[in-house]
Amino acid sequence: MSERWIGKSVKRVEDFRLLTGRGTFIDDHPPVGNVHHAAIVRSRHAHARILGYDVSKALAADGVVAVITGEDVAKETKPFAVGVTTPVHYYCAATDKARFVGEPVAVVVARDRYLAEDAAELVEVAYEPLPAVIDPEKALEPDAPVLHEKAGTNLAGHRRLVYGDPDRAFREAEVVLRERFRFPKYGSTPIETYGIIARWELDGVCTVWSNFMGPFIMHPLTARVLGLAENKLRFIVPPDIGGSFGIKTSIYPYIALIALASKHAGVPVKWIEDRREHLLASSSGTDRIAYREVAAKTDGTVLGMRFKWLDNVGGYIRSPEPGCSFRPTGNFVGPYRFQHLEVDASVVMTNKSLTGPNRGYACGHLYFETEGMMDRLAEKLGLDPVELRRRNLLRPEQFPYRTPTGGYYDSGDYPATLDKAIGIARYDELRREQAKARAAGRWFGIGVALVVDPSVSNMGYVATALDPQFRAKPEYLPKSGAVDSATIKVDPLGRVTAILGTTPQGQGHQTIVAQIVADELGLTPDDVTVVDEMDTFTRVWSISSGTYSSRFGSVGTSAVALAARKLRAKLVDYAAHLMERPVADVEFRDGAVRPRAGKGPSYSVKDLAGRAHWNTESLPEGMEPGLQATAVFGFTVSKAVDAEDRVNSSNTYGFIAEVMAVEVDRQTAAIRILKYVTVHDAGTIINPMIAEGQIYGGALHGLGGALYEELKYDEDGQFLTGTFMDYLVPTASEAPAEIEIAHVVSPSPLTPLGSKGLGESSSMTVPAVIANAVSDALAPLGLRITELPMTPSSLWHLIRDAQKT
């Protein structure tokens, strides 16, 4: 029997080149002839009208070949399409006003970066400063400064979604609780920042090399902005991207800006973002103010919830926002059975930098609130937090489960996953330890969080931002889908190559694909070469292509498996022809096609490759020459949003159960993690070691947002956290000493391998579980954590205020 590779911790093939400095990142890209360099002039004002430019000194500077201003942008490009009907014109640089500190207002192109930076300081921009507003609640007040006069409001979008009968649920409730939450604006600070090389050819073709991660719907949107046909704009993504975590989705405005600079300068233009630029003006998750209500019975049964959100998207709303509000529509109810829900979602523009996907996109916000309310309800009813959740969990026999908001939970055993987590954590023992600690005056707390982990976003969810009347118009084009492709081919010597349309940023696609193909074709992973460089001129791709939303683990691997199976079927047909046997009488086994019964020749993949390539006459009649197969996989459950605002916003849904124990220092308010257990149900695990790495990384991202990270501004909109001295990112020193990881496997019936996504994982649970643990630790003071991050300073002041009262 051939060795099975799926489910094994095969070492990552990517690591050797990365650890030995042989990676090919955007800044390592083979030199493009006569490349010049760009420096971006950015607004120093949070809100100001642009009165004019003087670029004469910059143009006269040594080595400068072009200066592009907002006037050029307004004349030669179109604004980007946005996901709402509010008239917001978002260009790749400021045209009429600057609306946040760091917004691009001009670009200088010079012989090298040093000369470009020097010349950028010579660009003079005349401003009329205007009042700024950074708080989303204040931005909606009648006398607030309006960022976009054509819109006449700072409210970029608003939807009220009603599922079931929430009014009835609250009327019949025996207990109603209300709470206000605040979630911070933070990013994921990938080790590699944005990078672009653009070359505008004389024939009108623009080639762009960049570390863009997708989705490739941004390709046609960018082509439209630049006035190009789609087949005149070529995106190439290098083999290696130094992390992204959603942030590099938002590089596309800079692609348009640097492409325009190349067109003006008549030379290829390269721009590599520095760290201050990245913190100042790349992208981040939204900060949110939320008001939550829960209706329940005294036995703990949750009847319904109400959500009210104000999501702060910064100076403009840009695609894929307002995904911050609607990406988790299908899993709004989390892992719980309640059927009645009201969502009041407002998207607000303020004088902060712009937002977009950040690891766990919108789910960290969602579960911080929901799991906080579940703990409050347990406290109110005198129930253990685990017991309250158990009474409301979906049961295994309910799967596949259709949520009231339209989600289609494909598989799961939530109680078993919870049981495994509390068993590993020795939950009862922790409670006994807590009782002893409290008796000794220590602040010891235990937190629990249960979340549904959505993966593979359905492109149709974004239309939830539009009201049903707008979507019902004849000219409206419904949107749906989640598609990926793969090609597998065998060369004349029998070596196998897999060609992907993905854009990995460290997830280990080459390793995982080699494992899958090896299993399907009876080979070893060493026999398989994987090519994962994206090129829109040569790859099979769709608007949903890319590596984001934890999609590769299900849609990407499914395309690979199906392509390998198509190729295997062709090998079987060919070998049966050579054996002069019916196809039903042969089988593919142990890397070769063999007779099912009796004696006869067998043909290995290498044998068949040699014959097929060198002697096409040997092929059966009607068989196409060549040994290759392409598969395009999409989900049948990926539908457009319906007239009742229901949508299956993702395509596979995992589950995570976490337990954390912490101690809060009575003198410094420092938080020490004593135990952290995380149990995941992500369907079939293809490579446990890679899965563990994703869970560790996700946990640290969540920890950053919970305890340290926030992009902060003063009241005038000036940016306060422009370096890693001010913007605190957790390091190995701040990481938990141990993360205990386990799995429950409920294979997805929707994917060929039974796999689901895993990449965002604990980034969406940690803010909830650690906030609940700290709240539990500080319960003797009557404190509950409702705002993040819990920096030592903010927590210390919170504790001192509580002690005074």
Residue ranges and their predicted role:
Residues 70-71, 227-234, 262-269, 324-455, ...:
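C-terminal catalytic domains of large/alpha subunits in multi-subunit enzymes
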Residues 16-17, 121-130, 134, 215, ...:
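Extended active-site and interfacial segments that coordinate phosphate-rich ligands
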Residues 77-82, 119-122, 189, 210, ...:
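Short acidic, glycine/serine/threonine-rich loops at helix termini
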Residues 234, 239-240, 244-266, 270-272, ...:
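Thiamine diphosphate
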Residues 111, 267-313, 557-587, 591-592:
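Phosphate/diphosphate-binding loops
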Residues 1-155, 176, 254:
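Flexible, low-hydrophobicity surface segments
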Residues 8, 14-17, 83-84, 153-196, ...:
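Glycine-rich loop/linker segments at domain edges
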Residues 145-226, 395-493, 720-734, 738-742:
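Helix-loop-helix junctions that connect adjacent transmembrane helices in secondary transporters/permeases
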